[in-house]
């Protein structure tokens, strides 16, 4: 009986320690990602995608402030700043991509136009996850 009680206390303590570590790690990573900018190259959706369904089920529309990213959750808000002119746009992730290596986002044409010229094709930007 005494051995069982001591074992239960040890297991409970171990679970509390592991849970504390897990929660602390999640909070630390989340805060770091939201407080600092990262650099990347971006592009925008081609005309042929207008009116097609995205991976989230939304219908893609050129004028909406949306973007594709490989891993960010659908609905995530991201601030993107053009390094060359400091113009910024806030987009919502609603699709998966881009497929080109070295690019973190494909923006809707409307979002891309807010920070750059479509004729440029790609832009060097910095970005941070807002929520």
Tell me the role of every PLM-derived stretch.
Residues 2-13, 19-131:
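Secreted/periplasmic proteins
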């Amino acid at each position: 009986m005494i051995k069982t009680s001591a074992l239960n206390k040890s297991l409970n303590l171990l679970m509390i320690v592991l849970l504390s570590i897990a929660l602390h790690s999640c909070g630390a990573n989340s805060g770091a990602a939201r407080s600092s900018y990262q650099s990347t190259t971006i592009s925008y959706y081609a005309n042929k995608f207008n009116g097609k369904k995205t991976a989230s089920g939304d219908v893609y529309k050129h004028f909406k402030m949306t973007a594709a990213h490989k891993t960010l959750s659908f609905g995530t808000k991201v601030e993107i700043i053009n390094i060359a002119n400091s113009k910024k746009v806030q987009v919502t992730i609603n699709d998966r991509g881009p497929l080109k290596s070295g690019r973190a986002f494909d923006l809707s044409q409307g979002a891309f136009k807010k920070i750059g010229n479509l004729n440029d094709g790609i832009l060097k930007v910095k970005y941070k996850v807002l929520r």
